[in-house]
């Protein structure tokens, strides 16, 4: 189906509607699964030697020192323009402001007299950040991951990226306070972070995007008792735009293409009650495509994308909630009026002047978002992902005495005698003290 084809939602059967919202299939092939499993086992067993061998094999780079030196980091910064450094600093300031505001106050309540319950927050002690390499290094992801890690107070922050690591990534890491950076990429980097090696320290939780091998490696280590936790399930990038008759077609087209150029498996969807706007957006997409260096990639993504005409904006919102996009852009008049009705989205962008690029780089929100429908149960990355919560309770004698019979009754009903005895023994001790 061509992206220029307008689809009337209400003319489609329920089966056709479900098909329109079906994402491009992602599944690790058996060969990827086996290859990744072998890499994990090899790195766990052979450590640094395996990491160097994989760098030579996959990255075509001979790596002697896995850890990047302070001198190399300083030299990388010296090669960057002041303009880029200032832009990074401005982005970090906004990211820091937004994520610092997410700090939760401690919970400290008396549930009944003499029964004090608290919830306290602690940082995840050690985190690993994976940053993909390639022709377009995602240094902005360093800012998005390392900044909340620093605010959360994570003691050890370790970054891995395929060699040779781009200057932008090294400088961004230094800017955000990352001290340990390693020339390791791919599934082998995930293995090193999960299990540790002679050079790379083992971490408690791994963050960051990657290709199919990295994604599969993260999945596998998260399911191993000796592995590590991960940030969230990963999938192709996606955007859904809701537009009304007042939307600017060129703006809508640019937002759709900003996702389509990510990869051939990306998906973009336009929902609008105005068929004329849909046609104008399709024309604007074609015009802008002609000027994009990554036009071929974007065209492949558009083949699985949709222009859907609806009855009204309320139906647009209902369809969007059913789809649960990673990015939701609302280019309508009074866009904020629709926010309360949105139930599933990774990040929402309101109005003509809130392009998705703002959230990707510098508005302050995090660009690491749930995709592939995981917005139904997962949240956008935030400070809480670098923290853990624990509860504390303290009962006074009076508080314990008042609650004792309740605990004994419940424990007896569950036939957990030792639980009941732990209370009964104390009740008897209090009676003896009286």
UniProtKB/Swiss-Prot annotation:
GO terms for cellular component: cytosol. Signal peptide: none annotated. The active site is at 326 (proton acceptor), 327 (proton acceptor). It catalyses: L-histidinol + 2 NAD(+) + H2O = L-histidine + 2 NADH + 3 H(+). Its cofactor is Zn(2+). Keywords: Amino-acid biosynthesis, Histidine biosynthesis, Metal-binding, NAD, Oxidoreductase, Zinc. GO terms for molecular function: histidinol dehydrogenase activity; NAD binding; zinc ion binding. SUPFAM superfamilies: ALDH-like. Disulfide bonds: none annotated. Substrate binds at residues 237, 259, 262, 327, 360, 414, 419. PROSITE patterns: HISOL_DEHYDROGENASE. NAD(+) binds at residues 130, 188, 211. Homodimer. Belongs to the histidinol dehydrogenase family. Catalyzes the sequential NAD-dependent oxidations of L-histidinol to L-histidinaldehyde and then to L-histidine. This is Histidinol dehydrogenase. The gene is hisD.
